[in-house]
């Protein structure tokens, strides 16, 4: 037996298919009639003659390692093998392409060699037995016997099913691509027994090369029953060659690839790769090589003819057995292949960043990757045909496609394993979620009745090889504040993709409307809600009354400087971080969604008070990075309830909470959705985004049947915390204070009615969460022309117009010259006419109305940077990944002329809200007086479709001015006006200016701060 040098192979057989209840006897999978098991040595030994023993000739050793396992499996354990490499050789056996010393078919019986063949068999059998005895004595003398690993115990029915799949893996080892998907936490129990089948990677076969003979020891588990196929088989080399490079033995492309463990079913075992077979290319080069080696290897393959004939003879019997015993395996295999196709199709949407500076980036990354992983054969660039089963012809194309995309997916997954939400260096310029490949794969079988996906590809579900410690290693510039800047933004693309709107309803999503359209929808929603209340409320009761603000009373503004998570409203969070939910709360929701969906009674059972208090302290101390691994699901669920209960006002706001309750108290059930849509449109944008995230999260919780928490059960447990019911004045600072209860402490009729309305309302909103955040179609029809007129168009020229002007010899800089002159004129006048407003620390923030009368204001943010203007221009122009934490993808589409280019970038949003996509025309100048620089950009129509799950945002104006202000320092001024879609003008007035100030602060912090070290020297 000859295997790979220094190879350690462990085969685990798990059983998983269901059989009839009357099938109670154990399936016997014998190794071979040539083998016997010895209890004393715990090893297998050969009995009699064997056709497996061959001299280690140069041409034979390349093919003999796998047949020891492939040829002697029992007929009840092997599926059929078939190969159709070409139409001409459809009837020819696949193994007939193996180099043969003669021109006769490989499977035909040798003529005139029966007598000599028996002698050869007996001779090699005796020598092999003697060699095994010597190895056994040597092993006992050195005391180096290893204990076989214990495999997981499974039920009898699951064990028999996995035997079929594992044996199928034996026959298809090297031909079937490993599945790189990560199973969901809700399906972990059902998926544990599939690991043996999913653990076989695709091998890349090369021409057989002469290799030195190695000695190997076969380890059999201690609980192995003689006459049965062992559940765990380990084959290890006894005399490894330390100087031999791993590339000398024919490994698969993903062997030794430590960054990828997703294809392995068990993290504690390695699947064997039968890679000593000759390359399965067309027969011409193989036959030519066979003719060259015919004289040297004469007689080497003669003893294999009867073995191959035996293997080929198993096909019909195994095919009949598999069809009769396991008829239900075929649909499951087909479903798995369909999931694999979806994963491969959506894997191309993994986030990447590319710049003009980095040329040949893919080649450099491939070189660095191959050097980082030892044993990865970089010289193997060819692809081989795939061998598939006769029973599954429909999976040929997916497997061929998977084989072709394997190198790209290996590179993408390696980048995922080492990247988090933080920006990275300009050399690699790739920002990805740790699980984007699996996150984007949402199969139809994993969608619940409401269209919500339960497929999670989060860090907690990934294999150990893909997990990174918290906090993860950063890949950034390595200078300045980037060394200490925390990993703040969470990448949760699985949540985004699972709640992606359909093509029919995509245009009606609130987060895809322009600011002017949102303003019109507010007016229409107020009119509609007023009509509902006037129609269904009792005339003599004041049910639809909003209290007027008291102008003479001074409201003291709360100070949130000492608070980070609990008790801080969403508006403050979005001004601080750009997202209305704290990072730690998003991480808690992600932890529950990915790992705790099967916890019975989640959000109903109470957690431990001391542990919940400890989690609260962790959130306040480190709001950007909290690890919930190992925490109780009930503790984390109670933490979420406390967060919404401790908000200064309900998420529905104090003004609209009563309105929401009255909708479900007074209106008939058929009007609930229309009234709730109108009330939702009236919410502040940051509150509406938090509510949408919460409802989508709760719908995923309710979709998991294991936890027994339906939408109604969740509403009963969460309605008091979300609506702030039964809250006294001393317990909360919310202005919505409940009326006094009766003296006996029982809730009054009003309290009971509001509790019932809150429970019914929250249950309805969880069930119809997809429709709740859509614009009513009839409202759009009523608004008619005014709604269409509010839709903005890119201010810049169309790309076709630019190309025509360029062909006519017109300078493209003329299209941006107006913006350049406006910026220089404002700078010369010291930005006169701007109104200063409070902003973040160490920044100056100002605003003014737009000259075109648009409701969106223009915002200006300024700060000083410890770098000259040219360096700051390069940082803004080419190194956006170093200071923009939300950046997903960036690239220069086309360089139109020196100093003018077409630029495309995508920024992320809080899940499940869509990302923002920008296509801008930008121009820069570095020849200003005193060494100043500027950069101006604005959106244009790129004549290309909007990316899936993304929203095309509009950059109306973006101007950067870098002015020198001392030795090695510059003053950076950023003027911006943009429509990000899905936000009202009020949101831009309260939030957008702070986001601009945060942007210039991040650019400033990306440079190192020079500090004088030591005392000042007297001259």
Swiss-Prot record:
InterPro entries assigned to the protein according to its UniProt record, in alphabetical order: Rho_GTPase_activation_prot, RhoGAP_dom, START-like_dom_sf, START_lipid-bd_dom
Would the keyword Translocase be found if you checked this record's keyword annotation? no
Where's the Rho-GAP domain? 569-773
Which residues are modified to Phosphoserine?
A: 108, 234, 237, 494, 502
- Keyword Phosphoprotein (UniProt): yes
**One GO CC term, this protein:** focal adhesion
Biased region (Acidic residues) positions are 334-347
Assembly, in brief, is: Binds both the SH2 and PTB domains of TNS1.
Q: What is the protein name stated in its UniProt record?
A: StAR-related lipid transfer protein 8
Q: Which species is this record about?
A: Mus musculus
């Amino acid at each position: 037996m000859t295997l790979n040098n220094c190879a350690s192979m462990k085969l685990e057989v798990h059983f998983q298919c269901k059989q009839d209840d009357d099938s109670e006897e154990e399936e016997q999978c014998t190794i071979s009639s040539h083998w016997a098991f010895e209890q004393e040595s715990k090893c297998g030994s050969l009995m009699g003659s064997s056709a497996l023993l061959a001299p280690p000739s140069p041409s034979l050793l390349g093919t003999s390692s796998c047949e020891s396992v492939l040829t002697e499996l029992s007929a009840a354990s092997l599926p059929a093998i078939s190969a159709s490499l070409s139409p001409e050789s459809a009837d020819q056996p696949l193994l007939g392409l193996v180099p043969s010393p003669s021109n006769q078919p490989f499977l035909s019986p040798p003529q005139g060699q029966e007598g000599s063949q028996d002698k050869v068999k007996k001779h090699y059998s005796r020598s092999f037995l003697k060699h095994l005895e010597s190895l056994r004595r040597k092993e006992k003398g050195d005391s180096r016997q290893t204990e076989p690993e214990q495999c997981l115990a499974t039920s009898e029915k699951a064990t028999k099913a996995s035997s079929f799949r594992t044996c199928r893996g034996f026959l298809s080892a090297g031909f079937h691509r490993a599945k790189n998907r990560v199973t969901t936490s809700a399906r972990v129990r059902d998926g544990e027994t599939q690991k043996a089948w999913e653990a076989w990677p695709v091998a890349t076969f090369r021409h057989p090369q002469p290799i030195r003979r190695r000695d190997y020891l076969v380890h059999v588990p201690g609980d192995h029953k003689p006459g049965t196929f062992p559940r765990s088989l380990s084959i290890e080399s006894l005399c490894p060659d330390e100087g031999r490079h791993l590339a000398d033995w024919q490994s698969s492309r993903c062997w030794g690839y430590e960054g990828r463990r997703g294809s392995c079913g068990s993290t504690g075992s390695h699947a064997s790769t039968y890679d000593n077979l000759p390359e399965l290319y067309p027969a011409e080069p193989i036959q030519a090589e066979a003719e060259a080696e015919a004289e040297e290897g004469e007689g080497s393959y003669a003893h294999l003819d009867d073995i191959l004939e035996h293997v080929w003879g198993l096909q019909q019997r195994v095919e009949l057995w598999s069809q009769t015993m396991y008829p239900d395996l075929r649909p499951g295999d087909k479903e798995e292949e369909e999931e694999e196709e979806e994963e491969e199709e959506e894997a191309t949407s993994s986030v990447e960043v590319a710049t003009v500076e980095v040329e040949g980036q893919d080649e450099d990354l491939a070189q660095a990757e191959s050097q980082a992983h030892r044993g990865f054969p970089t010289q193997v660039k060819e692809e081989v045909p795939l061998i598939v089963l006769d029973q599954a012809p429909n999976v040929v194309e997916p497997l061929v496609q998977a084989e072709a995309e394997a190198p790209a997916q290996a590179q993408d997954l390696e980048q995922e394993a080492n990247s988090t939400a933080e920006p990275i260096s300009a050399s690699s310029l790739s920002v990805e979620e740790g699980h984007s490949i699996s996150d984007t794969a949402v199969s139809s079988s994993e969608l619940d009745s409401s269209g919500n996906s339960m497929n999670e590809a989060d860090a907690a579900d990934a294999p150990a090889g893909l997990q990174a410690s918290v906090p993860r290693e950063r890949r950034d510039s390595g200078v300045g504040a980037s060394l200490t800047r925390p990993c703040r933004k969470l990448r949760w693309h699985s949540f985004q993709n699972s709640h992606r709107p359909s093509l029919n309803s995509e245009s009606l999503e609130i987060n895809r409307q322009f600011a002017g359209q949102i303003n019109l929808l507010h007016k229409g929603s107020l009119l509609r809600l007023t009509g509902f209340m006037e129609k269904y409320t009792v005339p003599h009761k004041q049910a639809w009354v909003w209290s007027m603000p008291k102008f003479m009373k001074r409201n003291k503004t709360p100070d949130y400087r000492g608070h980070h998570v609990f008790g801080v409203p969403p508006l403050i969070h979005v001004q601080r971080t750009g997202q209305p939910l704290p990072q730690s709360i998003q991480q808690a929701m992600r932890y529950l969604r990915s790992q705790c969906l099967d916890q019975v009674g989640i959000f109903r059972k109470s957690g431990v008070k001391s542990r919940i208090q400890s989690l609260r302290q962790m959130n306040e101390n480190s709001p950007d990075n909290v690890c919930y691994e190992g925490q109780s699901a009930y503790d984390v669920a109670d933490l979420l309830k406390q967060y919404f209960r401790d908000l200064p006002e309900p998420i529905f706001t104090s003004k609209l909470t009563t309105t929401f309750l009255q909708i479900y108290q007074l209106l008939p059930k058929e009007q609930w959705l229309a009234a709730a849509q109108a009330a939702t449109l009236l919410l502040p944008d940051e509150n509406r985004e938090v509510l949408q995230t919460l409802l989508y999260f709760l719908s995923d919780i309710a979709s998991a049947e294991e936890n027994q928490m339906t939408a109604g059960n969740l509403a009963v447990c969460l309605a008091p915390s979300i609506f702030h019911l039964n809250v006294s004045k001393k317990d909360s600072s919310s202005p919505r204070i409940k009326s006094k209860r009766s003296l006996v402490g029982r809730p009054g009729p009003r309290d009971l009615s509001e509790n019932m309305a809150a429970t019914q309302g929250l249950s309805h909103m969880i069930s119809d969460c997809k429709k709740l955040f859509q614009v009513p179609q009839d409202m759009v029809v009523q608004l008619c022309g005014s709604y269409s007129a509010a839709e903005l168009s890119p201010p810049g020229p169309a790309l076709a117009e630019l190309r025509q002007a360029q062909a006519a010899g017109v300078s493209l800089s003329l299209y941006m010259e107006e913006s350049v002159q406006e910026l220089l004129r404002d700078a010369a006048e010291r930005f006169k006419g701007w109104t200063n407003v409070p902003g973040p620390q160490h920044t100056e923030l100002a605003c003014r109305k737009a000259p075109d009368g648009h409701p969106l204001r223009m915002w200006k943010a300024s700060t000083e940077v410890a770098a000259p203007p040219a360096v700051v221009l390069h940082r803004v122009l080419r190194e956006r990944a170093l200071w923009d934490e939300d950046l997903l993808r960036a690239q220069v589409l086309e360089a139109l002329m020196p100093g003018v280019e077409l630029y495309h970038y995508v920024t992320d949003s809080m899940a499940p809200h869509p990302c923002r996509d920008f296509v801008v025309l930008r121009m820069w100048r570095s020849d200003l007086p005193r060494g100043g620089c500027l950069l101006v950009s604005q959106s244009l129509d790129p004549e290309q479709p909007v990316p899936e799950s993304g929203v095309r945002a509009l950059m109306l104006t973006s101007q950067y001015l870098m002015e020198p202000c001392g030795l090695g320092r510059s003053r950076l001024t950023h003027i911006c006006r943009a429509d990000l879609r899905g936000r009202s003008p009020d949101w831009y007035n309260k939030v957008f200016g702070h986001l601009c100030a945060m942007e210039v602060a991040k650019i400033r912090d990306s440079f190192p701060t020079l500090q004088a070290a030591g005392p000042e020297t007297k001259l």
